[in-house]
């Protein structure tokens, strides 16, 4: 388990939650799925990722430190569910009906696709864009795609194309 200056108490809480939910899933599914590898190497605005082939969960140490309780309650089971779905059903839609079932019926956790954590500390440079109704901040990656002509982004509220300020 790789660490990134995380207090041992937080690492232990993550492991407790992971083992608790894994045991719960194994009991409900009548299986004996192994404990996944766990690392704290996720970067950027993603709270975590599940790597199917290596059976690994990567967690974002910055977001974990800033949102410990909610992170442990929500993100750890979320990523575990991806691995369990892959083991149980094979390759399916990432947040499809199998994942939702695993989250709600097996793990007993609300099936939320995205986190609501404050991202200021992990967000890199953004670029201002406008539509009819508001200003938007595009990431460097999205901005570069617009500049290269590879993408066009629209406002989810008014449907207008976003234009650089």
Curated annotation (Swiss-Prot):
Subcellular location: Cytoplasm
Record note on cofactor: Binds 1 zinc ion.
Gene Ontology process terms (BP): response to stress
GO cellular component, one term: cytoplasm
An example Gene Ontology molecular-function term: zinc ion binding
Residues the entry annotates as binding Zn(2+): 78, 82
UniProt keyword Repressor, yes or no: no
Entry coiled-coil feature ranges: none
Keyword Nucleotide-binding in record: no
Highest taxon in the source lineage: Bacteria
Active site: 79
Domain SprT-like: 20-162
Keywords from the UniProt entry: Cytoplasm, Metal-binding, Zinc
Predominant subcellular localization, coarse grouping: cytoplasm
CC cofactor: Zn(2+)
Family the UniProt entry places it in: Belongs to the SprT family.
Record HAMAP family: SprT
NCBIfam families (UniProt xref): PRK04860.1 (NF003421)
Protein's name according to its UniProt entry: Protein SprT
Organism annotation: Escherichia coli (strain SMS-3-5 / SECEC)
Gene designation per UniProt: sprT
């Amino acid at each position: 388990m790789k660490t990134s200056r995380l207090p041992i108490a937080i690492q232990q809480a993550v492991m407790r939650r992971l083992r608790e939910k894994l045991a719960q899933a194994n009991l409900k599914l009548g299986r004996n799925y192994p404990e996944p590898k766990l690392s704290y190497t996720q970067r950027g605005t993603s709270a975590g990722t599940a790597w199917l082939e290596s059976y690994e969960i990567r967690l974002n140490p910055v977001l974990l430190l800033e949102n410990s309780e909610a992170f442990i309650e929500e993100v750890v089971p979320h990523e575990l569910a991806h691995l369990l779905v892959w083991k149980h059903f094979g390759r399916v839609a990432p947040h499809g009906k199998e994942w939702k079932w695993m989250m709600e019926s097996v793990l007993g956790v609300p099936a939320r696709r995205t986190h609501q954590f404050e991202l200021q500390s992990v967000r890199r440079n953004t670029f201002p864009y406008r539509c009819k109704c508001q200003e938007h901040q595009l990431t460097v990656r999205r901005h570069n795609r617009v500049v290269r002509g590879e993408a066009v982004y629209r406002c989810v509220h008014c449907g207008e194309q976003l234009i650089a300020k």
